Amino acid sequence: MTDSATTNGDDRDPEIELFVKAGIDGESIGNCPFSQRLFMILWLKGVVFNVTTVDLKRKPADLHNLAPGTHPPFLTFNGDVKTDVNKIEEFLEETLTPEKYPKLAAKHRESNTAGIDIFSKFSAYIKNTKQQNNAALERGLTKALRKLDDYLNSPLPEEIDTNTHGDEKGSQRKFLDGDELTLADCNLLPKLHVVKIVAKKYRNYDIPAEMTGLWRYLKNAYARDEFTNTCAADSEIELAYADVARRLSRS
């Protein structure tokens, strides 16, 4: 048995409902990179789906019964509840396939791991309370960001193949794996956005201007509705980290 909507000639869209974390008001989109990741994937697939925000302070009984013990994000696909984000991504890519739905997997394996350590470096930096450790942790974050910047500025094989003039230095692609958003971007961009907002708010840290590949990447992402319209408000992200971001002390 398969969940595919096109099985046996049935070309109807599947019934999909995505449940994401709600914001402070209990209704708007809250800070949750994993929720945004799935929201972006479904939007990019071009499939019809509904989104329900879940207020974790007042989780309705029907949702508790639907996915007991589970925090958003999760989704229902033709009535089946799916709760593991990585498995949901894999399932959607295997089920919502061409010709009807675009393939979103990255072509280059390196695109899937680009920026993989940024969020852990950011978390260590933002949670630190000791002034004497701040500079080293900041350097660790900057180093991870620079590694991503280097990847974004390094031409992909197909860019090298098409660059016959030899006068173009570096890559000019829009996203991790080319000029289209892929699953790799859906994973990284929500986290990168949080890093940008929170590090500035609580540590007055800006992503260095000389990281041209990284800023090109962010500029292109902010030009896409699939990203900007699935982001939580900046104030939501800042509030989510109000208790996490620690004040620095000399003790």
UniProtKB/Swiss-Prot annotation:
Which residue numbers delimit the GST C-terminal domain?
101-241
Annotated spans, Required for insertion into the membrane: 1-98
Q: How does it sit in the membrane?
A: Single-pass membrane protein
| InterPro entries per record | CLIC (IPR002946), CLIC5_C_GST (IPR042069), CLIC_N (IPR053823), Glutathione-S-Trfase_C-like (IPR010987), Glutathione-S-Trfase_C_sf (IPR036282), Glutathione_S-Trfase (IPR040079), Thioredoxin-like_sf (IPR036249)
Q: Where is this chain primarily localised?
A: Golgi
Cellular location(s):
Golgi apparatus; Cytoplasm, Cytoskeleton, Microtubule organizing center, Centrosome; Cytoplasm, Cytoskeleton; Cytoplasm, Cell cortex
What tissues express this gene product? Detected in lung and inner ear. Detected in embryonic cochlea, on microvilli-covered apical surfaces of interdental cells, columnar cells of Kolliker's organ, and on stereocilia of inner and outer hair cells (at protein level). Also detected in the eye, where it localizes to lens fiber cells in the lens epithelium (at protein level).
The EC number(s) attached to this protein equal 1.8.-.-
* BP term (GO), one: neuromuscular process controlling balance
Q: What is catalysed by this protein?
A: Na(+)(in) = Na(+)(out); K(+)(in) = K(+)(out); chloride(in) = chloride(out)
Question: Keywords of this protein's UniProt record, alphabetized?
Answer: Cell membrane, Cell projection, Chloride, Chloride channel, Cytoplasm, Cytoskeleton, Golgi apparatus, Hearing, Ion channel, Ion transport, Membrane, Mitochondrion, Oxidoreductase, Sensory transduction, Transmembrane, Transmembrane helix, Transport, Vision, Voltage-gated channel
Chain span(s) of sequence motif G-site: 32-35
Task: Look up keyword Oxidoreductase and say if it applies.
Answer: yes
Activity regulation, free text: Inhibited by F-actin.
MF terms (GO), sorted A to Z: chloride channel activity; oxidoreductase activity
Q: Mind telling me which residue stretches traverse the membrane in this protein?
A: 34-54
Q: List, alphabetically, the Gene3D superfamilies matched.
A: 1.20.1050.10, Glutaredoxin (3.40.30.10)
GO CC list: actin cytoskeleton; apical plasma membrane; cell cortex; centrosome; chloride channel complex; Golgi apparatus; mitochondrion; plasma membrane
Which is an annotated Pfam family here?
Answer: CLIC-like_N
Q: Which disease is it linked to?
A: Defects in Clic5 are a cause of the jitterbug (jbg) phenotype. Jbg is the result of a spontaneous mutation that leads to severe degeneration of the organ of Corti in the inner ear. Jbg leads to progressive degeneration of inner ear hair cells. Affected mice are identified by head bobbing, circling behavior and their inability to swim. They cannot hear well when young, and become completely deaf after 5 months. In addition, there are eye defects with aberrant development of the lens suture and formation of lens opacities.
Q: How does it assemble?
A: Component of a multimeric complex consisting of several cytoskeletal proteins, including actin, ezrin, alpha-actinin, gelsolin, and IQGAP1. Interacts with AKAP9. Interacts with TPRN. TPRN, CLIC5 and PTPQR form concentric rings at the base of stereocilia and may form a complex. Interacts with EZR, MYO6 and RDX; the proteins may work together as a complex to stabilize linkages between the plasma membrane and subjacent actin cytoskeleton at the stereocilium base.
Q: Which family does it belong to?
A: Belongs to the chloride channel CLIC family.
Per the entry, what this protein does is: In the soluble state, catalyzes glutaredoxin-like thiol disulfide exchange reactions with reduced glutathione as electron donor. Can insert into membranes and form non-selective ion channels almost equally permeable to Na(+), K(+) and Cl(-). Required for normal hearing. Necessary for the formation of stereocilia in the inner ear and normal development of the organ of Corti. Required for the proper localization of PTPRQ and RDX to the stereocilium base during postnatal maturation of hair bundles.
NCBIfam families named in the record: O-ClC
Present the record's domain note.
The active G-site contains a monothiol Cys-X-X-Ser motif which mediates glutathione-dependent redox catalysis. Members of this family may change from a globular, soluble state to a state where the N-terminal domain is inserted into the membrane and functions as a chloride channel. The redox status of the active cysteine in Cys-X-X-Cys/Ser motif likely determines the capacity to adopt a soluble or membrane-inserted state. A conformation change of the N-terminal domain is thought to expose hydrophobic surfaces that trigger membrane insertion.
Q: What is the protein named?
A: Chloride intracellular channel protein 5
Q: Please give the organism.
A: Mus musculus (Mouse)
Name of the gene encoding the protein in the UniProt record: Clic5
